[in-house]
């Protein structure tokens, strides 16, 4: 059986590429090679899975920023590394957050409140 974190990571990628509305639990189960029942047993419902994917996405961004900061030899190099990644981060963020804001406003509110703290 696949590890839950792998399912979250792969589903996050799918949501960024195709949007949260376009991806159904059937699509995720099929893509991951698991039954829909297993998916529901692991996550309960799509809303819970989206929340976990969003947390994973933010954590991935935080980890990338930390790696870039550690890799840089000085502040200017750190800034250049961050600029290099900025477009891809923002593109993925916008695609993911737009769908969540429109179709899952409760999750959006929780996520934006958590990030403000």
Language model regions located:
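Alpha-helical DNA-contacting segments of helix-turn-helix folds
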Residues: 49-57, 64
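Residue-level detection of the helix-turn-helix DNA-binding "recognition helix"
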Residues: 30, 44-45, 55
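Short secondary-structure transition hinges
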Residues: 87-117
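Basic, helix-initiating cap at the start of DNA-binding domains
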Residues: 1-18, 22-31, 48
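Hydrophobic alpha-helical connector segments
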Residues: 52, 66-92
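Short hydrophobic/aromatic patch on the recognition helix
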Residues: 33-43
């Amino acid at each position: 059986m696949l590890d839950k974190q792998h399912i979250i990571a792969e589903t996050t990628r799918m949501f960024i590429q195709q949007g949260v509305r376009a991806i159904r639990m059937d699509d995720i189960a099929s893509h991951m090679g698991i039954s829909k029942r297993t998916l529901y047993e692991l996550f309960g419902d799509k809303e819970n899975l989206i929340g976990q994917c969003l947390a994973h996405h933010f954590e991935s961004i935080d980890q990338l920023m930390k790696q870039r900061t550690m890799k840089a030899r000085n502040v200017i190099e750190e800034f250049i590394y961050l600029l290099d990644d900025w477009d891809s981060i923002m593109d993925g963020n916008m695609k993911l957050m737009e769908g969540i804001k429109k179709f899952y406003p409760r999750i959006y509110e929780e996520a934006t409140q958590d990030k403000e703290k």
